[in-house]
Amino acid sequence: MKEVQCISNVDNFLIVDKKLYFSNGKEVIGENGHSILISPLSLQFLNYKEPYFYIPDIYGNTYLIMENEVRFLKDIFIKDVISDSLLLVSKDKKTAVFDIKNNEFHYVLNFRIFKFLEWKKKYFLKNKNNIQGIEICTGQFLWEFSLSLLGKHKNPYTDEVKDFEVRRLIGIYNNILWVFLNAKGFIGLDIETGKLKYRIPEFHQAIGKTITSSYEDRKGFFRSDYLLDNEKGKIFGLGVDVYIEIDLNQEPPFATQYGLQEEFEKYNVKGNDTAEDYVVQDNLLYFSLFNQLKFGVLDINTKEIIYISEPIAVVERDDSFTQLKDLKVSENKVYILDSNDTLHIFEREKLNFEL
């Protein structure tokens, strides 16, 4: 890997169709440095779902970036793009379907939604202590699963007894909705009925060494942005120096923890600051060590770390400690944003990472 470009004043960024788009907090910049949008108010995160880009400002308005125009949607927060004419939005502390061609709202829920998953014109969402299934355009409830049915859990470090909560709606495989809970466990719900089909409170098998062996909750799952690979039928995630893989093709699903301590030690690195988010492309998992200012690549087939970079050159500031805060991959390029708002672009010249 070699760094081929460095762009300053980047607040957040996206890669769409192999092209870089980013916001500097006041402006959205497209390919070749072309300005797409300038806002008088501070902007938040740039989003994309075909066919639109959209970005909210700090006051709850949203800019909808269309092919031939930019529309300012006052007091409207876009949650999702349903089609080229329909948006799912938050307005007046409620959830509505907004017809952008006819400028009409149809309220479907009397509350705002935050964590949700769209699948075949249905939404699966978290509402307080429940997981619900609804039809998108009508708001009709299909089912509801109460997390209270799972009982309570005890924090292994404080002995505090707490309710279960949804940390992440991961995805759907074979008509099962997979959910990661705050107590570091997984549940699988039937998407037609909402009934609990599977519960995985801890992994079944451990392979390899890990620096987490002394942890009180050592059979639990670490916080991570777990991903579902529908082609392989597997859920996987990375936390600290642990790689988790859940095989959904087995009955019941089987969870394996792979300790990567020795893999990290090959590069004289400790895997104690791996970021929760990562990217998987062509059986390679790209991750960052956010405090060590490095990034690496794990082969998820062999469970071997095949590359770890040298520390990324950053400009330190007197008032803060620089970290890596975002990583994206597009074909042979790796994009890494640091906390000083500098985007570093690396190019991979060989698949075996010999450079």
Range-by-range predicted roles:
Residues 1-355:
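Secretory-pathway ectodomains
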